[in-house]
Amino acid sequence: SQKWHCWVCDKKGRSLYTLLKLIRAPKALIDEVREYKPNYKRKKIEESQTLYLPKEFKSFIFDPGNSVYYQQAYTFLKDRGVDATEIARYGIGYCTEGTYAERIIIPSYDKDGILNYFTARSFTGSNYKYKNPPVSKDVIGFEFFVNWNEPIVLCEGPFDALSIKRNAIPLFGKTIPTTLIKRIYTERVKEIYIVLDEDARQDSIKLVDKLMKDGIKTYFVQLQDKDPNELGFNKVWDVIHSTNQTSFSDFIKHRLYG
């Protein structure tokens, strides 16, 4: 930050450029500072556009091992119903050192197979379960695997999506990204299943209202205080298949009572 505040005259500003002008600094110095700030911003923007997997990333498939970390990470996935097929399909790996040490890495790729996000989940019981990259979440999770001609399923996290399997899109949070909303309309998606917890469903009510008005069949799937990963593939889909399309009266009830 370039904010400044003079405690004598109480003047303040948001950039060194305004401060230097105020004190009548040499023009050469002012020009140098003025050029520095845009370059700095541009550099940060360019850096933020490219995301890479952690350099310490180890693939379960291409870099198998017999270390304690490998066994712990693999067991963690297995206990959550993630088998070798999903591990290979989604390119899941883990880190034993670095910023994401002792964490499972679940990548997300866009339609062109370019990394657009990844989730880092502790497999050793850390107080901080997730430690994600400092980039925007305005992406379409698992986009590479989405078939827009079929109903899509919106869920909160990657483990939920791995449990649901079929056309599941993790939101990496409780709100629906703008990029995803736009894509839903451009692809003319006809049916959407929303598999989120109570808090997340409240955040999505306005969107559901808009989707319903635009003729998109919407389903609020209620898992009774469970998450997809707890229930597993078969039970989740039993609930999804038994869920009726959300009607206007259902929508009003959700709005009034949650």
Features from the language model and the residues they span:
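A generic structural motif
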Residues: T218-D227
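A residue-level signal for conserved active-site and pocket-lining positions in enzyme catalytic cores
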Residues: C6, L77, I194, P228
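N-terminal single-stranded DNA-binding subdomain of primase/primase-helicase replication proteins
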Residues: S1-L22, C95-Y100, D110
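Phosphate-handling DNA/RNA-contact segment within nucleic-acid enzymes
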Residues: T96-E191
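Short, aromatic/basic amphipathic alpha-helical patches
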Residues: D203-G215
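TOPRIM metal-binding catalytic domain and adjacent DNA-binding surface shared by DnaG-type primases
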Residues: I23-I105, Y109-D112, V146-N147, K182, ...
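Short, surface-exposed amphipathic charged segments that create phosphate/polyanion-binding patches used
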Residues: R103-I104, Y185-V189, N229-T243
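Acidic beta-strand-to-loop metal/phosphate-binding motif
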Residues: L154, K190-D203
